[in-house]
Amino acid sequence: PTLVKLMNAGQLNIDLHFLNFQNNKSSDNYSNRVFNGAIYIAEHDDDPDHLMSYLSNIYAEDFQPGELSNYEPVNNAKLEKQAVKAGVSEDVAAAAFSGKNEYLDWLTASNNYTILRPELFNSSGAFSSPTLTINGEYWDLKQLTLADTNMVDGFLKSIGLDADQVGVEGKMPSIGASGKPIS
C-alpha cells in the first residue's frame, strides 16, 4: 500500500522485474504461473493499482505457499482469486491463469538477464530476492535489522520522506531523482 500511494502521488517510479528462479522450490512451477499471470495483468488491465494489489496479495504472509519440503501447492484458481480480490476483472483474471503461460519465454529471458546484473548483487556478491534499488543504487535490506526498523520506515528514511508525506502530491523525497539512499 505504501508503494502504491507513493507511485500514485508521483513520488516514486517503480520498475518490477518478475523472476522465476524459485521454481525449483515448488512442485508446480509456482513462480512461472504467478508471474506469467502478473505480466498478463500488466498487459491487459489498464489500472496499475490492480497489478500492485495482486502482487501484495500473493506476497501476503497468509498466502505464501512455503518452499521445498514446506511447499503447499497453489492451484491457478487460488491465484485467479487473488487477482480478482485486487480489482482485476474476472475475464482478465481467468485468462491470466488459464494455464497457457504465454509469457513464459519472456519471463525466463528476463530472469536470466536480471540475476546476472552486478548492480543488483547483494553484499555477498550474489543476486537475492527481494532486491530493491533506489535511484539505481542497491539498497541493502540487512541494514533494516541492524537499524532495528521495519521495511516501510527504513525505506522512507532512505529516500528522505516522512510517513505523513506519503501519497501527498508535491512532497518529493529529499534525495530527488538521482541521489543515493540516505541509509
Enumerate the predicted regions with their spans.
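C-terminal cap of thioredoxin/glutaredoxin-like
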Residues: 84-183
